[in-house]
From Swiss-Prot:
Domain of life per record: Bacteria
Residues annotated as binding K(+): 226, 245, 247, 250
InterPro entries found in the cross-reference section: G_TrmE, GTP-bd, GTP-bd_TrmE_N, GTPase_MnmE, MnmE_dom2, MnmE_helical, P-loop_NTPase, Small_GTP-bd
Enzyme Commission number(s): 3.6.-.-
Species name: Aliarcobacter butzleri (strain RM4018)
Listed name of the protein: tRNA modification GTPase MnmE
């Protein structure tokens, strides 16, 4: 739980700006606002222009003061916001006066924590608030806005409702065997289990596909040494991030940079050239390259049109086949130079010249990124949420055999575990909810 006191913090980012907001939450919020403004006529949800004074009765600033009366506030408590002139000094001076009047500094995330304990938000909304502040792309903002609106909460509630249904009927079967139950109840339960499993599996698949929407999709550029990987990276970034040299093995480590493609943020990884290397440091770089490929959402495989397809190129082609689950864009570089490369070994490819722009590659990247981000599938935005869904699926899987064999106590145990797992996404599971369903659905003790 949290302390039942009054907290204060600056709600806007540090630095120079036109406006700063100081937020106060707790039972003494209105009292403190009255004290430091010498006004007592604040009305809920109305902005009042007020002069803010320090303890020596000297003017600090003129600010708009907005009072949110409990429970109609973000935290569910009395909240006062001081919208003062921007900059570091003024907002800190107001915070000092609020502290002198009886508040304490808020801990990181404490306003959201209070909102959670006062049932103003659930854990999914708390996570969305945290991540939307750090969002770097329009994709991320749109995805997190859906979670803020309650999309994931509604999804979890539907799963919980079905699991509570199963558990309620199972408990009745165990404790009140003489009760008349629907003849097809176990068939209903089995069907619900199948539907839940499919929903959760689809959600996990969509979430893995869209994982890069929040942090940025990882794009690995691979190819043998001196094929033009660093040059391509620099063209994508529009500045010289990687050293360009005719000497094979110049890039000995992975280089990672972020860039915007359309509405998407991608993290481009320029890998060390993949070949049989004798240099120890270069070998480490190649190992990191292979790791980068394994971790990438999209792979750009680069080949040199002006050189024959050799064993090193074939090694790259083998890597592509080994990573067939990934989106791979094959690029035949230096297409304006004399053709030496056997194009028949490539199923499909994009040609890039040394003189023209890379728009064909940009368009292909955008198509793949769009396909990963568009759609109405429920998406999990944190590892905590993913783990909760995985555990729910696992326990539903364990419950199947006891249901078939009639071992209802074991079945109830695994369904209870699944219920606790899925509930942890929004807020901890309360066993009283299951009892409410059980006693509400059946006439026990008639």
């Amino acid at each position: 739980m949290f302390e039942n006191d009054t907290i204060v913090a600056i709600a806007t980012a540090n630095g120079i700006g036109s406006i700063s907001i100081v937020r106060v939450s707790g039972a003494k919020a209105l009292e403190i606002a009255t004290k430091i403004s010498k006004k007592n006529n604040f009305k809920a949800r109305l902005a009042t222009l007020s002069t803010i004074y320090d303890s020596k009765n000297e003017i600090i600033d003129e600010a708009l003061v907005i009072y949110f009366k409990s429970p109609f506030s973000f935290t569910g408590e009395d909240v006062v916001e001081f919208q003062c002139h921007g900059g570091v000094a003024i907002s800190n001076m107001i915070v000092d006066e609020v502290l002198n009047a009886g508040a304490r500094l808020a801990n990181p995330g404490e306003f959201s924590k209070r909102a959670f304990f006062n049932n103003k938000i659930d854990l999914t909304k708390a996570e969305a608030i945290s991540k939307i502040i750090e969002a770097r792309s329009a994709d991320a903002v749109k995805l997190l806005a859906r979670q803020l609106k309650g999309e994931l909460t509604n999804f979890v509630d539907e799963i919980r409702e079905d699991l509570l249904f199963m558990l309620a009927y199972t408990e009745v079967s165990i404790d009140y065997a003489e009760e008349d139950l629907p003849t097809d109840i176990y068939e209903q339960i089995e069907n619900k289990m199948q539907k839940i499993s499919l929903k959760l599996s689809n959600t996990l698949e969509a979430s893995r596909r869209r994982e890069g929407m929040i942090e940025g999709f990882k794009v690995a550029i691979i190819g043998k040494p001196n094929v033009g990987k660093s040059s391509l990276l620099n063209k994508l970034l529009n500045f010289d991030r990687a050293i360009i040299s005719d000497i094979a093995g110049t890039t000995r480590d992975t280089i990672e940079e972020s860039v915007r493609i359309g509405t998407h943020i991608i993290k481009i990884v320029d890998t060390a050239g993949i070949r049989d290397a004798s240099d120890v440091i270069e070998k480490i770089g190649i190992e990191k390259s292979i790791q980068a490929i394994n971790e990438a959402d999209i792979v750009i495989a680069l080949f040199d049109n002006s050189k024959i397809c050799d064993d090193e190129d074939k090694k790259i082609l083998d890597l592509i086949k080994e990573n067939s689950d990934k989106k791979v864009i094959v690029v035949l570089n230096k297409s304006d130079l004399q053709n030496q490369f056997d194009k028949n070994v490539l199923d499909s490819f994009i040609e890039l010249s040394t003189k023209e722009d890379i728009n064909p590659l940009i368009k292909e990247l955008e198509l793949i990124l769009d396909s990963n981000t568009f759609g109405d599938d429920i998406t999990l935005v944190s590892k905590r949420q993913v783990l909760a869904v995985e555990n729910t699926l696992y326990n539903i899987g364990l419950a199947k055999e006891p249901l078939k064999s009639g071992e209802l106590e074991f079945f109830a145990h695994f369904i209870t575990q699944a219920l606790e797992d899925i509930s942890s996404i929004t807020r901890p599971y309360d066993n009283d909810e299951m009892l409410d369903v059980m006693f509400g659905e059946f006439c026990l003790g008639k």
